[in-house]
Amino acid sequence: AYSTAGWLGLTDQQIIDTIDEMKKNGFDCFKMKVGLNIKEDKKRLKFIRSHIGEDAKLMLDANQIWGVNEAIAHMKELTEFNPIWIEEPTARDDVEGHLKIKNALKKYDIGVATGEQVPSPVIFKQLLTTGAIDFCQIDATRLGGVNDVIAVILMAKKYNIPVCPHGGGIGLCNMIIHYAIWDQISVAKTQKNQYVEYLDFLQDEVFKSKLKVKDGHYIAPESHGWGLEINKDFMNNHIYPTGSVWIERENSGNILFKG
């Protein structure tokens, strides 16, 4: 599994604290957001790489902020930090653009990952059949349900592209672990390059069944179904407009309710 340490907006110390907490759980794969400013990206990547060590895996994520040529130019500036992939380097449905980026970065051993914003198996088919991506990042809720997810996983197997599910959303990690277990045992039949995203702060206190990791890997869940039964306290605190979360926002002046 891997997790994001280098969120935009965090201070250097907050990033270091996040990395240290991840290391306690055995993580050796870390992701950082990039794209707004090349000088700032280099500065943050330098201390992140030094803190995680040269042997740790580093992923970069641009969240579709670049055009194709801009993505290539920006990533060439970051090759010294040895990232294993650049995630969402350009628009989600620009298949030709992803292929151009992939071909340009191949000599630097930087892969292209995308898929968390792709809503259709047809777009995944185009990305896979053209060889435009190195890592297939399905989103369990962006696609149209279990059948669509299964279709994409099977297509990825046909083209020998590892599936690395997106987990950046409340409940997503609870769902993708089931797909990952099935894929790694029965479809891909390997864990090689099958990086599954893990974000604990999007799960804590929300669900009765908490996800667990050990030595940087998910522990198979024991709860029934997806494991998405919500804690009553969390639900009550977030009920609109009577929950404590909304009342606090109203009292702070950040949001006003009209009777």
Stretch-by-stretch model annotation:
Residues 1-104:
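Metal-dependent enolase-superfamily TIM-barrel catalytic cores that perform enediolate-based chemistry
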Residues 226-259:
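Extended hydrophobic packing segments that form well-structured cores
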